[in-house]
């Protein structure tokens, strides 16, 4: 049976056409999104997700209706999960500014879509085999006031993910406009050197990941720019995101990272308890 999704508070069948050709997210990528892990009737990092979502809407000057609140979205997600009969799921909220052109003077009414997909419980476990990554070199992510947002215009990340698929990498690292590493196509990056954990600061253009925020609040992680040379000299490398938790990296290009001690410890002590 096809799954259901929600558009502006109403349930629809999976293949229902509800988005106008004038939708500004379709035309210009004018919107933001959240990807959330649902596990055993809860979303453990929901507060971080809703803060990031509504913070982005405010930052991008969306005209958000008073009824469109975090509690309203939370209840819709739970209702959709129930209707789709899911226990473990990936949830996506997509917000768009409305319909119209770039120069329209009429007020724009934001809209939203909520989707869910089943996900295996094992997907949150620490990976047995280390990831093999490459560096996407055909594009750069700008360092600006918007670079930390999860916007719907994800061109550099799209191309990086395509490169990873073509090269048979598990993921691709994205460079910023200073030729330093910002993050990966789908995750934040960390490296370990001399028993200290580092991650690029938001001023280096990574996405402001919720798992990143969680770990930064739990642990003495140093925020520091990451050059390709520093990455090659790291003792350990790992990635995090809200859906997969933490994954250790075995190779970036031809550079090996044979240890997963830090990633395994973080998984055991901090990430696994979130979803127990």
Regions found by a protein language model. Give the residues of each.
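Helix-start/capping segments and mature chain N-termini
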Residues: 1-79, 101-276
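Ordered, amphipathic secondary-structure segments that act as subunit-interaction surfaces
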Residues: 77, 83-95
């Amino acid at each position: 049976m096809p799954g259901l999704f929600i558009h502006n508070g109403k349930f629809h069948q999976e293949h229902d056409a509800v988005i106008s050709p004038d939708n500004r997210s379709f035309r210009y990528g004018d919107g933001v999104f959240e990807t959330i892990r649902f596990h055993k009737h809860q979303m453990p990092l929901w507060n971080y997700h809703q803060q990031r979502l509504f913070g982005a809407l405010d930052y991008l000057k969306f005209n958000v209706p008073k009824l469109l609140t975090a509690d309203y979205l939370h209840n819709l997600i739970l209702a959709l999960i129930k209707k789709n009969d899911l226990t473990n799921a990936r949830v996506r909220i997509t917000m768009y500014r409305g319909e119209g052109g770039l120069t329209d003077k009429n007020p724009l009414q934001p809209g939203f879509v909520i989707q869910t997909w089943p996900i295996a419980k094992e997907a949150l476990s620490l990976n047995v085999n280390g990831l093999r990554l490459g560096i996407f070199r055909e594009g750069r992510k700008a360092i600006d006031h918007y670079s930390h947002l999860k916007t719907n215009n994800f061109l550099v990340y799209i191309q990086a993910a395509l490169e990873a698929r073509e090269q048979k990498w598990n993921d691709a690292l994205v460079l910023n406009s200073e030729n330093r590493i910002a993050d990966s196509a789908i995750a934040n990056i960390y490296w370990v050197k001399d028993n200290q954990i580092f991650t690029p600061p938001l001023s280096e253009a990574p996405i402001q990941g919720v798992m990143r925020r969680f770990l930064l609040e739990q642990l003495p992680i140093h925020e520091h720019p990451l050059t390709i040379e520093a990455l090659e000299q790291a003792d350990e490398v790992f990635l995090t995101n809200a859906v997969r938790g933490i994954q250790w990296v075995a190779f970036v290009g031809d550079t090996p990272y044979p240890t997963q001690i830090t990633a395994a410890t973080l998984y055991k002590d901090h990430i696994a308890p979130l979803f127990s």
